């Protein structure tokens, strides 16, 4: 029987992954500290593109930003909205796994390209013994409950630790050699020896066991949990080792978007995977580019003469979906607030209740981000988020406004928003009607934007389902092969 009660973690309030620098307090970058007036200053308007120039690489100059603007976009993603308390600690546990579960990913976040094999697994090794909880001569925790370990340590007489892939409030993820499987490299999540984290870990394990047993060959591309075990009070979950997240690939490629044929292949796999969850009465609730990992993130480097720079092109677009720590069954309690801010559906913001359609909205946001190289909803304020939606998608339906208890966002059944305020000017600069984001207007781009528009339908009852999305004309080219 699965757990019906999930553990909250009030001390987790950041969207970031382990591998990223902490971003809180005085270090937060203010939302309007950058000027969007410099965007596209070197680029021609999209209407000047001829049909023959609709190739994705040629149109990408629309998304060229100076270094400061790109750094802003990256940092902005780490500014998780206030007030969101996830049901599980696992959101950033899986974030660590998802972002740093590959060798290429580990190398990318360090100043040196060489791997430091003798580096200890955690900075906690330097803590004095007075800050440790010692259970035996060889097993120690630090004061926060993290297992103290280093390269060469062996878990369960089988998993030899090679390196640390990431660390967070909940625990850490390490890369290991599985000596029980002829030296296979795996990712092992080591959960803190703290009660609420252990309970939440077991809840996630039950979701993973359900999904993996229903789809043992990973046809539907959910990450494979190979096994789990208890290591002196630490729940350890063993995962297959994957490549970079789709977000990290974009980031390491200077925020250049994916080619449209790659978007098609990735989108189809994502829709298949999440549709599998929906048919199993689950809602993922935290879909975003960080939670979509490439099986292998190998690429070729080509010089783009138009943009005068090297750019990376994927060799293989196969993906896996990760982070099931907040996945919710239909018959379980539904927290009022779910999803990462940029991918949060309007029914969640308006506290109207949510179910599987909130995942579809998130996928729509992901696809437009793959297409542009950046998220269109760059905000951490709910009313501003709604204003961005109205700027991009048109007015919020009256019946949703009438039903919401979030009256502070509205006045006379309209969004209470001053377009002439600094926030209003920011939204006006940053956002525009959805179709104006199109890089060109050939048939395949039109089909993609039609699919995205159906996914970003305000009313969840009218939003396209994933069964329907998989039959959308945007995917016709895949079915002909």
Swiss-Prot record:
- Any single Gene Ontology cellular-component annotation: nucleus
Please name the top-level EC class of this enzyme.
transferase
Show the ranges annotated as biased composition (Basic residues): 106-119, 126-136
Q: Where does ATP bind?
A: 165-173, 189
For the modification Phosphoserine, which residues carry it? 136, 138
Record localization: Nucleus
Picking any one GO biological process from the record gives: regulation of RNA splicing
Write the record's keywords in alphabetical order, separated by commas: ATP-binding, Kinase, Nucleotide-binding, Nucleus, Phosphoprotein, Serine/threonine-protein kinase, Transferase, Tyrosine-protein kinase
Q: What is its main location?
A: nucleus
* Segment forming the signal sequence: none
List each copy of the Protein kinase domain by range: 159-475
Which ranges are annotated Basic and acidic residues under compositional bias? Answer: 8-19
Q: Which reaction does it catalyse?
A: L-seryl-[protein] + ATP = O-phospho-L-seryl-[protein] + ADP + H(+); L-threonyl-[protein] + ATP = O-phospho-L-threonyl-[protein] + ADP + H(+); L-tyrosyl-[protein] + ATP = O-phospho-L-tyrosyl-[protein] + ADP + H(+)
Record SUPFAM superfamilies:
Protein kinase-like (PK-like) (SSF56112)
Regulation of activity: what does the record state? Answer: TG003 inhibits its kinase activity and affects the regulation of alternative splicing mediated by phosphorylation of SR proteins.
Family annotation (InterPro entries): CLK_kinases, Kinase-like_dom_sf, Prot_kinase_dom, Protein_kinase_ATP_BS, Ser/Thr_kinase_AS
Query: E.C. number, please?
Result: 2.7.12.1
Annotated PROSITE patterns:
PROTEIN_KINASE_ATP (PS00107), PROTEIN_KINASE_DOM (PS50011), PROTEIN_KINASE_ST (PS00108)
> Is rRNA-binding among this UniProt entry's keywords?
no
Family as reported in the entry's similarity comment: Belongs to the protein kinase superfamily. CMGC Ser/Thr protein kinase family. Lammer subfamily.
Q: What does this protein do?
A: Dual specificity kinase acting on both serine/threonine and tyrosine-containing substrates. Phosphorylates serine- and arginine-rich (SR) proteins of the spliceosomal complex and may be a constituent of a network of regulatory mechanisms that enable SR proteins to control RNA splicing. Phosphorylates SRSF1 and SRSF3. Required for the regulation of alternative splicing of MAPT/TAU. Regulates the alternative splicing of tissue factor (F3) pre-mRNA in endothelial cells.
Subunit structure, per the record? Interacts with UBL5.
Can you name this protein? Dual specificity protein kinase CLK4
Q: Where does this protein come from, organism-wise?
A: Mus musculus (Mouse)
Q: Which gene encodes it?
A: Clk4
